[in-house]
Regions:
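Conserved active-site and cofactor/substrate-binding residues in soluble primary-metabolism enzymes
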Residues: 52, 56, 125, 136, ...
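Glycine-rich beta-strand-centered segment in the early N-terminal region that forms part
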Residues: 17-32, 45-98, 142-144
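Short alpha-helical
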Residues: 34, 48, 92, 136, ...
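Extracellular beta-rich ligand/substrate-recognition surface
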Residues: 2-10
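Short Gly/Pro-enriched turn/cap motifs at secondary-structure boundaries
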Residues: 5, 16-17, 48-54, 117-122, ...
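Cytochrome P450 core scaffold surrounding the K-helix E-X-X-R motif
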Residues: 37-41
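Mid-domain Rossmann-like dinucleotide-binding core that forms the NAD(H)/NADP(H) cofactor-binding site
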Residues: 143-209
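Cysteine-cluster motifs in flexible loop/terminal segments that predominantly coordinate metals
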Residues: 35, 72-77, 86-139, 143, ...
């Protein structure tokens, strides 16, 4: 695993693969992205310290824990299948979870920010493997979607889809996207797929080419 050890300092640490317990899934990481949040953590501008970096990822099932036969959409999963996990947990007890707003669970970041030396160690995407917990959503990836596309599905893509869903966009709406960075490109593509007219603005001319 690649662990933060200080501001702009990382260390490769080696651990034995953890035992897969009931409800868990051990995944081998195929591809991981560098998110803007990872940069903030690297620069020491985030609450997470000394954790395993990375959260945007796609991987293949190595081992399924007892009771795991499908993903969270009900599709059958088996070793070797590609999957994409949600990087936060859902405690199922806080007000946000009880209201169905799992993305803002009070304890959602407990696992992601865990110290690298704490078992099960494989808690970030910048590692050979990743352990999905029993209360952590994951989804099987369709064969026709390449790794470099799906790796960002659990963060940037899903965040922009959620934002667009909140504004109740309809076909022929005019959408102005301020900023043509990663999130801006995601929101532009999603808006376009919904039939909206998309206008992108950015102070960096090269991003608009």
């Amino acid at each position: 695993v690649l662990s933060m050890t200080g501001i702009k300092k990382v260390e490769v640490k080696e651990f034995e693969l953890p035992e897969v317990e009931k409800g868990q899934v051990l995944m081998r990481v195929i591809k991981s992205n560098i998110c803007g949040s990872d940069v903030h953590m690297w620069e020491g501008k985030h609450i997470f310290k000394n954790h395993v970096l990375g959260h945007e990822m796609v991987g293949r099932v190595v081992k399924l824990g007892e009771g795991v036969v499908t993903d969270y959409a009900g599709r059958e999963v088996k070793p070797g299948d590609r999957i994409c996990p949600v990087y936060y947990l859902t405690c199922q007890k806080c007000k946000a979870c009880l209201d169905g707003n799992f993305n803002v669970c009070t304890h959602g970041s407990d696992y992601q920010g865990q110290h690298a030396d704490i078992y099960p160690h494989f808690t970030g995407a910048f590692a050979t493997h990743y352990m999905i917990q029993a209360n952590q959503y994951f989804y099987k990836v369709p064969d026709n979607i390449p790794d470099d596309v799906v790796a960002g599905a659990n963060c940037g893509i899903s965040q922009m889809y959620y934002a667009i869903d909140q504004i109740k966009m309809s076909a022929n709406d005019i959408v102005v996207v301020q900023g043509a960075g990663g999130l801006g490109l995601f929101s532009s593509a999603i808006s376009h797929s919904k039939g909206a007219r998309v206008i992108v603005i950015d102070s960096v001319a090269s991003r608009l080419e």
